[in-house]
Each structure stands twice: as C-alpha cells, then as structure tokens.
C-alpha cells in the first residue's frame, strides 16, 4: 500500500505550498478555480481543476469555485450550469457557496474610488485606437494620455457619471496610473473599468460599468482569503499588475500568484473563441460534440472522469510549455476501460451467415462479461441459425496469415462453436450476400475432438435476436497536429472525423444506460450516446480503439 507521500503527485507548486506551511507563512491552504462563464470547459481546464481541487483535498484545505463574470455580453447562465456539472462530474466539490466576482462589484467600485483618491487612477477619453497608439510597443515606451493629470475631484466626478449611465460606451474608461515607460506592457496604465450597457446574468441592470479581469481577479482572491492563486503561464506578466493593485488598496489579505504551463493537445484547438466558432458555424453538433476537447464532449464520447484525472496526473505540472500527443490521453481511457468495461459483441459492417445444419430453436449461450474479472458475471447470448459477422472477417481466398473465415475452412465464433464456410451467394454486382456454413455442435467451449487446429476467433451477433444500432466512429477533428497554426483553422478540419455505420449489437445491450461503456470485442471501446440513444434507436459512440493508432497517423 502506498504511503501518503507516495500517493501524492509532486510538483513545484506543491513544493512552494510545503515550504509556506513549514515556515508558518500560511496555516492552511486555500485555492480557487475561477473560470469565466463564456463557454464550456475543455480538457485544459480539467488540468487546472485537478490541480486546484486536488491541492485542497491533499492538504485538507479549501478550494472555491468562482465565476469571473465581468463580461456580461459574452457570458450566460448556460455556461455557469455546465461548468458546475463538469466540476462535479470530474469528482470534485467546491468549498461553501459558489462565488461570483459580480458579488464583489460594490467593493470593487470602492477600491477603484480609493485608487482615484490616491492619485493612482484617472478617467481617460482616448479611443481604443488612440490608446493602442499611445501605449507604444516592446521597443518604444508609451506616452502619457492628455487626460492623465486630471484632478482627483474631476476623476471622481467623471467616474460617478460613468457609473450613473451618463456616459456612452467607448467614450470614457478608468485607467490605473502606473508607468507608461514600463518594460512590461501590462503596467502601461491599464484600463480597469469600462462602460457596458448590458444585462448581467447575476446582477441584471444594476451596473453599467464593469471592472476588467486584471483588476477584479486579484481583489477577488484577496476577499476570499486565497493563499495560492494558481494560473497558466500567459498570465505571468500580469502578476506585476496583480501585485500592484493589492499593494495600493486597503485590503488585509495579500495572495501570491503562481503560474504553470497550460495544456496543449495535438489535433485540436483550446481557444474558446475557436471552439465557439466551431459551434456557431455548425461545424460540430454542439459544445458536447464527441470530437470536441470539451469536458462534456469527452464525457459524451465515453471518457471517464477517472481517465481524465489520470491523464492530468501523468502529464504533471511544470513551467515548460509543450504539446501532448493524443495517444497519451487515449492510453488513459484505454487502460481504464480495459479493466472496467464489460465485453459485448457488435457487428458494424454485417454480412449474413446461414448455418445449414443448425436445425433446433434458439440456443442460449452463457458468455463471460470480462475475461479477467469473474465478478462482472455472465450474460446470455442467443445463438441462432442465421447470424451476422463482419464483412472483413470473410474471404474467398486468403494466405495463412489470415486467421478468420475462409471459404472451405473453419473459424471459431466467440463464446460459441466452430463453423466452416461451405459456399457463398452473391448479388448481381458480385457482392457477397450470404455465406452458407456448417457447424460442429461438439465444439462449444472445447477444441474439436479429432484434434484439428482452429486458430481464428471472430465475433458475431444473432440475426434473429440482434438489435439494429447506429455506430458513430469518431476520429481526430483536424488533419494537422497544430491546427491553430493554420491561416484559417477551419480549412484543416478533418472531413472524415465522423463516420456513421448501421450495424447490429447483441440483445443484452437494449437496457444499457446512457454513457455505459463496453468493449465491443475485437473492435474497440464504445459507449451509449447520452443524447440520441433510446430503446427504439440504439446509438453507440466509439471512445477509442483497442490499440494506439496515432503512431501510424503521424507517419
């Protein structure tokens, strides 16, 4: 049995936390997961969820779920609910009530007034284009706005007008007065408030000025008593603004921000803007399309929460930016389902077999649900005179390497008997329509008594009792490993990312619940689609194949 220290992952953030606790800097750990509710969570967010909530669990601390909801035009209660569901599904609970940055709008306004009174914020009337021009660039310092030296009284009056709805959008903004010559662009008098006449999903029409993320985030952390504010590397420079705000307002708590590398995954995109475009342009069926990297999309495809947590554990937490191969994610779900998914049989491209010497009624066979786990029990599988097999599992002629059914030769049916292909029937186009076979009724669970060798084993489904099913084969959404690098990422969408087949599954699957996973023997891992499947129309999604196919795709 692993000790607690062996069971815990280790990384540089946990080392910082250990040092803070050992030194007495903090008596306990308080983290947070602060998504903006402007889209569905993706697997990159799952990494942050596992990190922040995992730290709170391991250190017996707290982790808040906080919605950084300062942009009402792009946010929606639909996204709030989906995020809550995703966090719970991944196996985590937040501490106390859900937090919203909008809960702090009154206090944030007060802190903005404090900065004005200290001469550290001013109301600017530069247009966005002028502001960009005045800001300079990485090689040239910015120049001060002509409104930078307004008096405190004038700034207070104008900011009050902004709050009261007396100023149109885009005419005025409140900027922090820091350093227009700073080598860090984020410190060149950033905007901290702007006018927006938009209804907010939490506060309604109470406010028409909204704080910017960089101003809101650090103050929300402080108000909630966050000890370790963990975010991705793109916010590394923003830490200077994070610290500046907290250093210049009257607030008790002074959290520290720490950055780690975000998750980049091959053959997909993580940008919410790009993901939203895929949805709004109907290039996918929705945020939960099984080809999407969203948590809901992965869940619908058949990924388990345990497999995603294991993936996040395997890739670790570092400051090194890298791109993870899709095979790494798929290996986690393959390992999970290989151990935990019951087996079943399905035929995706059926051709009929007639067993001519089978003359009795339906024979009910007892088949194991898992070859290595007897506790999963058994199921009843009907064996009938007519069955379906995969079209690719039969050839009229084949070499010795082909271990399936060949005309004039034998093969074993999984969990059933040995059959021999005697003759075939074709249609006018030359396609095989029926394979006529004989069976050895003394080979159920045993080898032929005369010692003849039958090497191949194929799966099958009763033609009389099998259930028609729609089988959705999902592939990578893009044809290139880094679609974000394309001039237009839409042009590299994989036109073959979804193939829909109509096949047959064994009758035991009729009562399978939504999201239930199975290994379709010899094919791959599939799950019951959570939206479209019903008792009248079964729909299964391929989660992953039995073997890694990504190495071949990369060649």
Curated annotation (Swiss-Prot):
Its main location: cytoplasm. The keyword Transmembrane does not apply. A motif ('KMSKS' region) lies at residues 269-273. L-glutamine binds at residues 68, 213. GO terms for biological process: glutaminyl-tRNA aminoacylation; glutamyl-tRNA aminoacylation. CDD domains: GlnRS_core. The keyword Magnesium does not apply. It catalyses: tRNA(Gln) + L-glutamine + ATP = L-glutaminyl-tRNA(Gln) + AMP + diphosphate. One of its GO terms (molecular function) is glutamine-tRNA ligase activity. It comes from the Bacteria. ATP binds at residues 36-38, 42-48, 232, 262-263, 270-272. Its EC number is 6.1.1.18. One of its GO terms (cellular component) is cytosol. Keywords: Aminoacyl-tRNA synthetase, ATP-binding, Cytoplasm, Ligase, Nucleotide-binding, Protein biosynthesis. A motif ('HIGH' region) lies at residues 35-45. It is an enzyme of class 6 (ligase). SUPFAM superfamilies: Nucleotidylyl transferase (SSF52374), Ribosomal protein L25-like (SSF50715). It is found in: Cytoplasm. InterPro entries: aa-tRNA-synth_I_CS (IPR001412), Gln-tRNA-synth (IPR004514), Gln/Glu-tRNA_Ligase (IPR050132), Gln_tRNA_ligase_bac (IPR022861), Glu/Gln-tRNA-synth (IPR000924), Glu/Gln-tRNA-synth_Ib_cat-dom (IPR020058), Glu/Gln-tRNA-synth_Ib_codon-bd (IPR020059), Glu_tRNA_lig_a-bdl (IPR020061). Belongs to the class-I aminoacyl-tRNA synthetase family. Monomer. This is Glutamine--tRNA ligase. It comes from Photobacterium profundum (strain SS9). The gene is glnS.
